[in-house]
């Protein structure tokens, strides 16, 4: 009589594979969630950054920072898929562009958070300092630096 050869995986082999997949998922899921939050926060940085030219130009022409979006010559409502609003304001000797994230439909770590670009005039050029109440790991790398110079438009 010939013995039958068993084919396939044993139960212990399948359990080991499932355990390995679980460990990999436990590592990958938080990293993916952080990636999603960073990509959503970059929309706020890009929308706010897109207003720097208009705000700088207003200051160059008038010698004061614009009080609101209308004064800066930008749309009253600036928003995006993840950004609720982008608002221009004057704060003392600085111009401020503030982007506020939506409260729903965005990653939990950035819900309702704000990102502000504070402009300072420096003898014909401007520097922009980025600040946010969101965790630094969600901010674009260029926003983690103290100030980035912007030439006069």
From Swiss-Prot:
Q: Which organism is it from?
A: Eikenella corrodens
What family is this?
A: Belongs to the N-Me-Phe pilin family.
List the protein's name: Fimbrial protein EcpC
Keyword Transmembrane (UniProt): yes
- Which cellular components does GO assign to this protein? membrane; type IV pilus
The record's subcellular locations are:
Fimbrium; Membrane
Where are the N-methylphenylalanine residues found in this chain?
9
GO biological process: any one? Answer: type IV pilus-dependent motility
Q: Which residues form the propeptide?
A: 1-8
Disulfide linkages recorded for this protein, renumbered to the chain, are 130-143
Arranged from A to Z, the UniProt key words for this protein are: Disulfide bond, Fimbrium, Membrane, Methylation, Transmembrane, Transmembrane helix
PROSITE patterns attached to this UniProt entry? PROKAR_NTER_METHYL
Q: Which residues cross the membrane?
A: 9-29
* Pfam families with a match to the protein in the record: N_methyl (PF07963), Pilin (PF00114)
Listed InterPro entries: N_methyl_site (IPR012902), Pilin (IPR001082), Pilin-like (IPR045584), T4P/T2SS_Core (IPR050470)
Task: Tell me what topology the record assigns in the membrane.
Answer: Single-pass membrane protein
């Amino acid at each position: 009589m010939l013995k039958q050869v068993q084919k396939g995986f044993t139960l212990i082999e399948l359990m080991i594979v499932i355990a390995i997949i679980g460990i990999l998922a436990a590592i990958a899921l938080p990293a993916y969630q952080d990636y999603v939050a960073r990509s959503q926060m970059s929309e706020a940085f890009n929308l706010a950054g897109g207003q720097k030219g208009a705000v700088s130009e207003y200051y160059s022409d008038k010698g004061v920072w614009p009080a609101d979006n209308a004064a800066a010559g930008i749309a009253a409502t600036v928003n995006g898929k993840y950004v609720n609003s982008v608002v221009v304001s004057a704060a003392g000797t600085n111009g401020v562009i503030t982007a506020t994230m939506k409260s729903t439909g965005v990653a939990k770590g950035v819900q309702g958070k704000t990102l502000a670009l504070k402009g300072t005039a420096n003898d014909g050029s401007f520097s922009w300092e980025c600040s946010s109440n969101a965790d630094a790991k969600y901010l674009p790398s260029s926003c983690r630096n103290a100030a980035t110079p912007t030439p006069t438009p």
